[in-house]
């Protein structure tokens, strides 16, 4: 949300790490649909990954996506990494790649891309600011 707020304000997105951590993401409506499917079709005790397989991204790539699609040409991603970055307590770099094949076998598939998710978030924040 902070990336989006900065982009809407025309402020650069500042990263204090390389932003290398990667993970899959899933929009809330896609996750809720998956839960409903699992309640009716899932196997008791079985684990299922609910994720958008094609939306595996790093923090830096998310920042760039938001800068481009929310901030337009007025927002950049700036890396301001302190020399003693390890003393700040940032989470270690992780790479988590989930596979939603079992969910897809239940006829579930994600519908909302990360780009669309951030555009929706920007629209929501803008509306809240106007009504707030």
Task: Label each region the model flagged.
Residues 7-132:
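C-terminal substrate-binding subdomain of Rossmann-fold SDR/epimerase-dehydratase oxidoreductases
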């Amino acid at each position: 949300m902070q990336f989006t707020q900065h982009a809407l304000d025309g402020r650069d997105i500042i990263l204090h790490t390389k932003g290398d951590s990667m993970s899959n993401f899933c929009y809330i409506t896609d996750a809720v649909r998956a839960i409903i499917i699992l309640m009716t079709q899932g196997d008791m005790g079985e684990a299922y990954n609910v994720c958008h397989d094609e939306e595996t991204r790093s923090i830096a790539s998310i920042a760039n996506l938001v800068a481009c699609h929310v901030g337009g040409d007025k927002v950049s991603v700036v890396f301001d990494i302190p020399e003693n970055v390890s003393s700040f307590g940032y989470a270690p770099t992780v790479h988590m790649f989930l596979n939603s094949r079992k969910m897809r076998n239940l006829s579930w598939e994600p519908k909302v891309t990360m780009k669309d998710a951030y555009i929706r978030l920007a629209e929501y924040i803008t509306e809240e600011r106007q009504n707030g």
